[in-house]
Regions:
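A late-sequence structural motif
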Residues: 103, 245, 253-293
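Secondary-structure junction motif
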Residues: 145, 178-182, 188-211, 275-283
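Alpha-helical linker/hinge and terminal dimerization helices associated
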Residues: 44-45, 65-91
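Acidic, Gly/Pro-rich loop/turn segments at junctions of secondary structure
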Residues: 114, 125-187, 245-247
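Hydrophobic hinge/microswitch elements
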Residues: 126-131, 135-139, 145, 194-255
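Short helix-boundary/capping micro-motifs
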Residues: 12-30, 46
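A short LG(V/I)-centered, amphipathic sequence patch enriched
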Residues: 40-59
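Central regulatory/effector-binding core of bacterial HTH transcription factors
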Residues: 88-149, 221
Length: 293
């Protein structure tokens, strides 16, 4: 029998969290999607793994047996993937948006000249995974925007901060302002990331800076092109200043905002993992360049 390792990761998260809500938040997936995947694993194995009730998810006897073995299985698989990448001399670097990556392409080009035996793969993830692939073990390190759920389990090095401003439709009454007070936006419909992104979503909605004022969500998306389209159609969105340089739309303008904290950009990698000298060299070069940018 072949079982998708992603299903095992989902199972392990629900078993450890004791609820779909906590596991969905940790995995950056929606609760309905997680429920569907757990059902799929149960169908594949032919046994119920959880007893479901209003108070949460309790492991069945079969589920407890699997829960004991899954962490070791996943550890072995993850190490096999890493060993394969090392043997192939591949470094995988995740990112979310071009603005955060900035001059990384130049650093990678220089690294390839200095270390021609290594290949660097840049992998872009959408906003449904603010860890940029680290949560699922899909990358070796990532350029990330802080804060995001699960970052306390990672080794994170903050590199720089940049202004958070607002994206507005060019037809918006505030579009001609050089600077906007955040309170002027409180009643506007905001573009939000999916609820599964937790603290990431809250940060980009500036929920802590609304002084209790209720939030209006006008659109939900995890993709930059849909995000810009929603703004052009009349929603508003907080965004880092670099967005104006790397993403554009003829009907969208970027304006400075007073009353919100800046965006922080960092490098993240798993804790406690065997260090690869080539990866250390690459990340140090990226850190130096981004810190100066």
């Amino acid at each position: 029998m072949d079982v998708d390792t992603r299903l095992l990761r989902y199972f392990a998260a629900v078993a450890e969290e004791g609820s779909l809500t906590g596991a969905a938040r940790r995995l950056f997936v929606s609760q309905p999607a997680l429920t569907k995947q757990i059902r799929r694993l149960e169908d594949d194995l032919g046994v119920p793994l959880f007893a479901r009730s209003r108070s949460g998810m309790a492991l069945t006897e079969a589920g407890r047996e699997l829960a004991v073995r899954v962490p070791a299985l996943l550890d072995v698989w993850d190490e096999a993937v890493r060993a394969t990448a090392r043997a192939a001399r591949v470094l995988r670097l995740g990112f979310l948006d071009a603005g955060a990556v900035g001059v990384v392409h130049e650093v990678i080009a220089e690294f390839r000249q200095a270390q021609p035996e290594w290949r660097v793969e840049l992998r872009q993830f959408d906003w449904s995974d603010p860890s940029a692939g680290l949560a699922g073990g899909e990358v070796d390190a990532a350029v990330v925007r802080l804060p995001f759920p699960g970052q306390e389990a990672l080794e994170v090095r903050e590199l720089f901060v940049e202004e958070r401003g607002v994206l507005l439709s060019a037809r918006h009454p505030l579009a001609n302002s050089k600077t906007v007070e955040f309170r002027e936006l409180w009643d506007e419909p905001f573009v939000a990331a999916g609820a599964e992104t937790g603290a990431w979503r809250d940060y980009w909605l500036a929920t802590e800076e609304r002084e209790g004022h209720p939030l209006r969500v006008g659109a939900v998306t995890n993709r930059p092109d849909e995000w810009l389209g929603a703004v052009a159609a009349g929603c508003v969105a907080l965004a880092p200043a670099s967005t104006a340089r790397f993403y554009s739309h003829p009907d969208v303008v970027f304006r400075s905002v007073r009353g919100v904290s800046p965006s922080r950009v960092g490098l993240a990698r798993p804790r406690g993992r065997k260090r690869e000298a080539a990866l250390d060299e690459l990340l140090e070069a990226i850190a130096r360049r981004l810190s100066r940018s």
